[in-house]
């Protein structure tokens, strides 16, 4: 097998010229995975054949669509375990016919999890919760759910397992979200030592709970004066990093902290949001001792997400970056700054008063005077 593999890797690039004189470059290669499975590598493309078979748990969430899209357009077969029929429909068109496979599963059903991973050579676990519900607690999702997925990965000897955790993951944290995320990391590493751990900072994008939350009229009550500090990261950058980890086996057994280039407080981001939407959102600061129990009651009494006691606790924890963890720099990625994307993601929140604002620049004033006679 070794001489054959070496011969395939050394195959020269084939250049084909058509009748019009244009050159079409065809590159083919064979990669042998850790378990000896041959993977046909090519230039990629939506309709290309070969490539990896990847299972993406949590693909229907904010981060999931970005990694599914990147894998599918490279010719990979993507298996998407889902719970809700309506939440997964938009993912079907991210890949060519037959490249995106949907499998219904239950996080408490080991058989459905094993069915989702048994044909794959890479598994992504993006499952997580920002708040507990009556059906799933933080421990159910971040620890027990991750444990079942890791056991299925180990049972079928999957080549790569990439587990997405969270920034500030600490088993001794007073915040249950951070504590369960850290214990989940320990569990998956004990079952599958070659697990790649990814800890993204608070992410911003089209479906985020950062920019859109600050732009919403419902986000009124805070407890720490919005003074918590963190490095917000673009969700597209995180998706690109997850894709590159698949192609680079040196990322196995490593821990990555993925965060943006600048540190902001929530108050600073809120000011950027207000400037972008031409509105002033009101925020009322309530002491932690009062707001935390109220948030806990609302989380249990209402069936739609408003706030939870753990989210209030999270406001008092600044982001702490692990100096020993690898970052975007080790993947050759330059993370984007949130200040460059506020208009892109928040333009739909703009007030109609925007159209009545006076010209802002001298050029706009000249154009305004030029066409004023048409009004």
UniProtKB/Swiss-Prot annotation:
Q: What range does the transit peptide cover?
A: 1-26
Question: Where does the UniProt annotation locate this protein?
Answer: Mitochondrion matrix
What are the disulphide bonds in this sequence? none
- Source organism, top-level taxon: Eukaryota
Q: Name one GO molecular function term.
A: protein-containing complex binding
Cofactor binding note of this UniProt entry: Binds 1 FAD per subunit.
The keyword Electron transport is assigned to this record: yes
Q: A Gene Ontology CC term for this entry?
A: mitochondrion
- Name the needed cofactors: FAD
Cite the Pfam families for this sequence: NmrA
Q: Where is the signal peptide?
A: none
Quaternary structure (record): Complex I is composed of about 40 different subunits.
Regarding protein family, the annotation reads:
Belongs to the complex I NDUFA9 subunit family.
Per its record, how is this protein called by name?
NADH-ubiquinone oxidoreductase 40 kDa subunit, mitochondrial
Organism of origin is: Neurospora crassa (strain ATCC 24698 / 74-OR23-1A / CBS 708.71 / DSM 1257 / FGSC 987)
């Amino acid at each position: 097998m070794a001489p054959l593999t070496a011969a395939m890797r050394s195959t020269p690039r084939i250049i084909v010229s058509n009748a019009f004189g244009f050159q079409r470059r065809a590159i083919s290669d064979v990669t042998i995975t850790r378990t000896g499975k041959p993977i046909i590598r090519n230039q990629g493309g939506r309709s290309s054949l070969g490539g990896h078979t990847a299972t993406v748990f949590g693909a229907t969430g904010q981060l999931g669509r970005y990694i599914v899209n990147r894998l599918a357009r490279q010719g990979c077969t993507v298996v998407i375990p889902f719970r809700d029929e309506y939440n997964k429909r938009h993912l079907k068109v991210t890949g060519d016919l037959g490249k995106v496979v949907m499998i219904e599963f239950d996080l408490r059903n080991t058989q459905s999890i094993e069915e989702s991973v048994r044909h794959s050579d890479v598994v992504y676990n993006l499952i997580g919760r920002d708040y507990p519900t009556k059906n799933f607690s933080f421990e159910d999702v971040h620890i027990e759910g991750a444990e079942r997925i890791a056991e299925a990965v180990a049972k079928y000897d999957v080549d790569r397992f990439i587990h997405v955790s969270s920034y500030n993951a600490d088993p001794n944290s007073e915040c249950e979200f951070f504590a369960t995320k850290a214990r989940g990391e320990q569990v998956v590493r004990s079952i599958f030592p070659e697990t790649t751990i990814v800890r993204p900072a608070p992410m911003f994008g089209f479906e985020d709970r950062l920019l859109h939350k600050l732009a919403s009229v419902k986000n009124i009550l805070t407890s720490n004066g919005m003074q918590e500090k963190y490095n917000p990261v673009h969700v597209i950058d995180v998706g690109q990093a997850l894709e590159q980890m698949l192609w680079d086996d040196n990322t196995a057994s490593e821990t990555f902290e993925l965060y943006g280039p600048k540190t902001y407080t929530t108050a600073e981001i809120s000011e950027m949001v207000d400037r972008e939407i031409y509105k002033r959102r009101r925020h009322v600061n309530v002491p932690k001792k009062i707001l935390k129990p109220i948030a806990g009651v609302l989380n249990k009494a209402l069936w739609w997400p408003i706030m939870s006691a753990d989210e209030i606790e999270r406001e008092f924890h600044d982001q702490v970056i692990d100096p020993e963890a690898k970052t975007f720099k080790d993947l050759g990625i330059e993370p984007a700054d949130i200040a460059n994307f506020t208009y892109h993601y928040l333009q739909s929140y703009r007030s109609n008063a925007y159209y009545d604002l006076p010209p802002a620049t001298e050029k706009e004033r000249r154009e305004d005077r030029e066409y004023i006679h048409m009004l």
